[in-house]
Amino acid sequence: MALTYSSMLELGSKMPHFELKNVIDDKMYASTTLLNKKPSLIMVICNHCPYVIHYHEELKKINHDFGDNIDFVAISSNDIINYPQDGPKQMKKLFLDLGLSFPYLFDETQDIAKALKAECTPEFYLYDNKNMLVYRGRMDNSSPGNDIEISGNDLRSACTNLLNGSTISSNQHPSMGCNIKWK
């Protein structure tokens, strides 16, 4: 595992178009379903990264707290030939075991990860209801082994401010985690 930081996609960027399979129900899920409805949180994650695993419970809490007003979508873009634990069957099992209820999409071509300029897992991209990027970066400043309590403060603050119509600080911190496993 190589510790990698996110590249911080430019704020105001439009959400890239995607149409990917949701491994939970095997149906196609398109970004067009998110257009001009409510805000969206796209999370680039995977199954095996300790930095993603570190946030499983907090991710469930954030989804519980904001899921009625923000569409949550997780995407895994890792190479499954060399990392079979990140394959669709394992993705589905993980989400069902965790009790997560939002789509978990498989980006087999890695095109969406590239469009988002994703570098690591996890990365979080919060889009307003016009599909413009308003937050990108970390969930909080905790990480495996640093003894800082998981709070989700950075991501929670961005979600709260977006929903309240308040300004989201442009002073945002990159996420850090495992590098995306490119083909």
Segments and roles (model prediction):
Residues 1-171, 179-183:
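Chalcogenol-based redox active-site neighborhoods
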